[in-house]
């Protein structure tokens, strides 16, 4: 069965219940959340996340598997500022606790950026950070995300991710989140040869580690190292390639999460595309009028 959903918001008093309600309104059967704002460390107590009501709503609507995304202020690749590294380690630990409390098994993490010290130094620091964070007892896996390679990001190649995984003691607690926009922007030819890319992933990392897919089109050509998401079928990856990935038999059990941009010129009146994009991917037919339909919410 196709597991498809999107990033949804966990906010207000309803928290996890609000996230599940939003996902159901899009016709989703999985979803991804940040446990608070992705750009800061302010978090509600676990007791205030409304977990029981959220889980009941999920069960009622057949949602069994959800994903958490770690905030992007965490940078355990930072070799230059010990405070940034220490904050990243401490905050990642608390996010894992929250992920466990919510009942999710995967927390997606941007591996980190070396901020000028070079990829080797950044990777060593990321390994150090993950070794401080991971415990044998935890039930959650950290899903290292494939990165586009913009700026000083580490994890732009399968080899870099494998290097991180190989260096970590409890690496059974590590998995991978494959982002279509990022891998395309990093230079992988997922448009014409996705099976070849998947074989390469299997050879270097192992398909058994692939636990989350981020399904995004890209505003930029392959190899641009930009990381700018586009709506499904309206970018340089295109509908056919993304549809092929979403329905790929080897990836059937993996949750596919859309992180495509809201639609509309007026920043105060942007519309979420997810209901329409999910329906289009289920139907496996590209709709050229999709963006208009999203704005009119037809």
Swiss-Prot record:
Catalysed transformations (reactions): Endonucleolytic cleavage to 5'-phosphooligonucleotide end-products
SMART domains, A to Z: AP2Ec
Binding site for Zn(2+) 1: 69, 110, 145
Enzyme Commission number(s) from the entry: 3.1.21.2
One BP term from GO: base-excision repair
Pfam families in UniProt: AP_endonuc_2
Matching CDD domains: AP2Ec (cd00019)
Alphabetized PANTHER family for the sequence: APURINIC-APYRIMIDINIC ENDONUCLEASE, ENDONUCLEASE IV ENDODEOXYRIBONUCLEASE IV
Family: Belongs to the AP endonuclease 2 family.
NCBIfam families: nfo, PRK01060.1-1
Function: Endonuclease IV plays a role in DNA repair. It cleaves phosphodiester bonds at apurinic or apyrimidinic (AP) sites, generating a 3'-hydroxyl group and a 5'-terminal sugar phosphate.
Name recorded for this polypeptide: Probable endonuclease 4
Taxonomy of the source species: Bacteria, Bacillati, Bacillota, Bacilli, Bacillales
């Amino acid at each position: 069965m196709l597991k498809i959903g999107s990033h949804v918001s966990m906010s207000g008093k309803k928290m996890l219940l609000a996230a599940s309600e939003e996902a159901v309104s899009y016709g989703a059967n999985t979803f991804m959340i940040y446990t608070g704002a992705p750009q800061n460390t302010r978090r509600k107590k676990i007791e205030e996340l409304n977990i029981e009501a959220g889980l009941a709503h999920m069960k009622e609507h057949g949602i069994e598997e959800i994903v958490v995304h770690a905030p992007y202020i965490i940078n355990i690749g930072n070799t230059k500022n010990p405070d940034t590294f220490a904050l990243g380690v401490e905050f990642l630990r608390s996010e894992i606790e929250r992920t466990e409390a919510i009942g999710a098994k995967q927390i997606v993490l941007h591996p980190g950026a070396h901020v000028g010290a070079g990829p080797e130094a950044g990777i060593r620091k990321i390994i150090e950070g993950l070794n401080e964070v991971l415990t044998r007892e935890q039930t959650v896996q950290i899903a290292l995300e494939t990165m586009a390679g913009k700026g000083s990001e580490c994890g732009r190649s399968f080899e870099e991710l494998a290097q991180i995984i190989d260096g970590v003691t409890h690496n059974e607690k590590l998995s991978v989140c494959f982002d279509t926009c990022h891998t395309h922007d990093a230079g992988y030819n997922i448009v014409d040869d996705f099976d070849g890319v998947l074989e390469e992933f299997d050879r270097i990392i192992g398909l058994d580690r692939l636990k989350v897919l981020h399904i995004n089109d890209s505003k930029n050509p392959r190899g641009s190292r930009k990381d700018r998401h586009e709506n499904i079928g309206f970018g340089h990856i295109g509908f056919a390639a993304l549809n092929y990935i979403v329905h790929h038999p080897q990836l059937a059990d993996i949750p596919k999460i859309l992180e495509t941009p809201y639609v509309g010129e007026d920043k105060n009146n942007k519309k979420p595309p997810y209901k329409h994009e999910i329906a289009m991917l289920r139907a496996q037919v590209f709709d050229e009028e999709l963006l208009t339909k999203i704005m009119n919410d037809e």
